């Protein structure tokens, strides 16, 4: 299917409030609401420290991306920076890897949607729910970017209000005594200690924790459609650290005080489970609505992100020119449709392997995310060196350059080692060389066909 040709320019339809809430929405997603369950089982209350460490690394990456985006706000975000400052293969590989990453994230979140629906209707297979919301969200994204922005704005508002309310309500239950005798801050250290399985238990969970932060860099993708990226991008980036502290560290500290961590199960959102265990059915149902909203929010962002990344690849000559078609509303219809067709594989995966689908997709996401973040840090090093040679002082410099970049790269290497030692996740690491080889073949085919373009 091909959209009517109306040019190849995206409209700058995202306001500052959209950018801020898109950044916030990226920080509150399935990783926190569902992925944290398995981490709690292995790391206990130490999960709080794990999220703080991974959050700091995510913030460093965000500042590196933010510095580049403020200087050059373009569609395709960092793949263009890799292309321009590192080389054509780096741009080709990072762009396609990012697209595949968000296709996988989209699949994982659609799977999570199915799990949340089963809280109310256990008899409905996950693939049915995934298929229904797949159609709805893609239809919405085919309207215009303002509709996406408004939808994500309100999704994020719901998530923020809910998490803050949960922290306040949970704190009240904790300190008023209304949470029952098991609700006490001593749960953070009395059930086998803060790190019941030692640092090993925490370290082995860092890969899954990292999954939670896989939406933060979406801010960089919004730059091409932001009214004033020079102001909105730095503001959104700097606020990430506070959001991580409040929404991850704060919410988990309250939750793990309300109920011993040993009562958490891996296949249910700990947020919903804890209030359900406390006998508060109303709050449990309300929170399930929130975690469902969170998954839909991230999937909504994925649809947006995938289409814009493909658009950026097409602009660079790294994807078919037909993907540059933009309709009269400024929507890249072809890229949305192509991304949707690939994401539809999620429905098939959930049909064939409903029990293991989420775990498999999460492992694949983390591997792609490691490549993604590593390439952001490496591209940023090249970017900064180029600017220094040009005598240019950037407006939004990254923190701790270049030490921060190397710390991030060391962290990524550590995550890969952890995944190799984790049953069920090692396969995704073994697939990395295969994936790079596929990218290499694709690049050679593109070069042979003479479709190279000059970076601009």
Please name every model-derived segment.
Residues 1-7, 80-83, 109-130, 162, ...:
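Helix-loop-helix connectors at the membrane interface of multi-pass transporters/channels
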Residues 1-36, 41-46, 58-63, 72-75, ...:
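Membrane-interface "cap" regions at the ends of multi-pass membrane proteins
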Residues 5-10, 48, 121-125, 157-285, ...:
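Helix-loop-helix junctions that connect adjacent transmembrane segments
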Residues 11, 34-129, 133, 240-249, ...:
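Extracellular loop-to-transmembrane helix junctions
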Residues 74, 97-112, 213-226, 281-321, ...:
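Membrane-helix boundary/coupling elements in multi-pass transport proteins
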Residues 80-82, 87, 119, 205, ...:
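TM-loop-TM module centered on a large, flexible mid-protein loop between adjacent transmembrane helices
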Residues 114, 127-183, 213-214, 237-241, ...:
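Membrane-interface loop-to-helix entry segments
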Residues 154, 322-331, 370-423, 452-456:
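C-terminal membrane-solvent junction of multi-pass transporters and transport-like membrane proteins
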